[in-house]
Amino acid sequence: MGREVTHVFAPDALKNRVVVVTGGGRGIGSGISRMVAAAGGDVVIIYPVDSEKVHADKVIAEIVAAGGKASAYLCDVGIQSECVRVIAEIVKDKGRVDALVNNAGICDFTAFDDITPAIWDRHIAVNLSGPFYLSQAVVKDMKPRKKGAIVNISTVSAYRGGNQQVHYISSKGGLSSLTTSMAHEIAETGIRVNAILCGGVATDINVKQRADNEKKTGKPWVDRPGVRQMGVPEDLGKAVVFLISDASEWVTGSLVAVDGGALIS
């Protein structure tokens, strides 16, 4: 799906670094996992439920076949105790966490009037609370080394709005604010925190959601004028590699738009 993207970083840019990628087995997360592995990172994929393990295993197989390192852990990031548990397990098994990529997220298209407390609470739990609790856990591990990187995957829609996405966009707007606030507070620890504002990416789930929404509303999806073709997961992966590598050692508290021009269109 989409165009082919070539890795542009040295194969040792992330050598021996343990990089946790939530939702790293599907969609955008799979592109992030592959790009991190291609740069030498030891990829740790977090998947939410047993039925998703097959997708994580597929990405792991691809990475290992290419000579990389990857493993997977089960965790529902929408549950605080699960976030604490999984980071503790990873640190026990790997010795440390060098970088965390809070990529896992959900987005169910629902009209504002139809958003129930359950829908609202689940989006906040997965898209905002999960990154908060995971970040708390990894920062405790990173502080003694005075080095580490956290990247949150947010969206350009947090600054533009969007139909039937009030719950999703609100949670991602909170994630952007979490990014800048964390970066400010823990700057002296040597841990950097940045976010990527993601544009439209051609993933299986995204394409299906657009098709379902068109069927539901009876209106075709219209991309914003001036926006380049939809991105591919590896576009986000390259940006992540930059933000967790030494190439960005002077970058923290930044909200980086990787969107093909959507934010300015």
Q: Where are these predicted regions, by residue range?
A:
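Short C-terminal tail/terminal secondary-structure segment
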Residues: 2-9, 160, 241, 252-265
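Conserved glycine-rich cofactor-binding loop
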Residues: 25-27
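Substrate-binding pocket helix/loop in short-chain dehydrogenase/reductase
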Residues: 97, 111-112, 116-124, 217, ...
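Alpha-helical segment proximal to the catalytic Tyr-Lys
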Residues: 140, 184-188, 249
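Residue(s) in the substrate-gating loop at a strand-loop-helix junction
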Residues: 155
